[in-house]
């Protein structure tokens, strides 16, 4: 009933974050992208105002299932077919539209999510073309070059670990929830550096993670505002 009342009160914009379940080496949570997608989306909603955030879509394309490719070569990964992912997003968007949301925004924290979100938004716009509903896909939410630039401006050069761990994402996790990075276990095991930075300077790393989350949220909000000004459906 809370959602119903908010919609009746004029709140008709909803963010739909997508994440993923994938291998990330011995320390990082399989749900890395889900934690980050939720945190950045919640901050973006705060900046936008009058915006709700739907539950994170946790399952996304991660490679062929059989024979396995991509992240599916590693245990713990869960993958969807591209057409399954697109259909899932379209049904989620349609459900939100039927209940009164007129602005449905897809945001994805992984490279494999992008095409499916773009196609789903297009299908929703086609399906609801006679209504006020519009769906948007925001690629600016996942802008890895921008993250690298952010680090470089602070004199930090990204050195990805051999087992698919990237500093920009680990910094966000440290700011969101240290256990998802197994922070204490790392220190106890003698792994006290990450991407050339000392994990012992925790406060500094948390501050960097919060800056990244804020930067991504602001970039996403800017992109959403720009899409809202477009007369055509994209």
Walk through the language-model features, giving the residues of each.
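Extended, histidine- and acidic-residue-enriched regions that form the cofactor-binding/catalytic faces
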Residues: 1-105, 109-234
């Amino acid at each position: 009933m809370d959602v119903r009342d908010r919609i009746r009160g004029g709140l008709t914009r909803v963010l739909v974050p997508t994440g993923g379940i994938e291998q990330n080496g011995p320390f990082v949570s399989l749900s890395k992208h889900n934690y980050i997608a939720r945190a950045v989306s919640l901050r973006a909603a705060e900046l936008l105002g009058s915006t709700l955030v739907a539950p994170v879509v946790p399952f996304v394309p991660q490679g062929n299932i059989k024979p396995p490719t991509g992240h599916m070569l590693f245990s713990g990964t869960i993958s969807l077919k591209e057409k399954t992912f697109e259909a899932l997003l379209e049904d989620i968007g349609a459900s939100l539209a039927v209940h009164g949301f007129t602005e449905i925004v897809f945001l994805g924290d992984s490279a494999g999510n992008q095409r499916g979100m773009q196609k789903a938004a297009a299908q929703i716009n086609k399906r609801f073309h006679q209504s006020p509903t519009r769906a948007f896909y925001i690629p600016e939410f996942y802008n890895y070059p921008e993250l690298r630039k952010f680090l470089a401006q602070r004199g930090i050069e990204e050195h990805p670990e051999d087992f698919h761990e990237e500093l920009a994402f680990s910094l966000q996790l440290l700011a969101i929830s240290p256990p998802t990075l197994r922070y204490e276990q790392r220190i106890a095991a003698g792994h006290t550096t990450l991407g050339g930075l000392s994990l012992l300077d925790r406060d500094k790393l948390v501050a960097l993670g919060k800056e990244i989350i804020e930067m991504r949220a602001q970039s996403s909000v800017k992109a959403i505002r720009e899409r809202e000004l477009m007369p055509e459906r994209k």
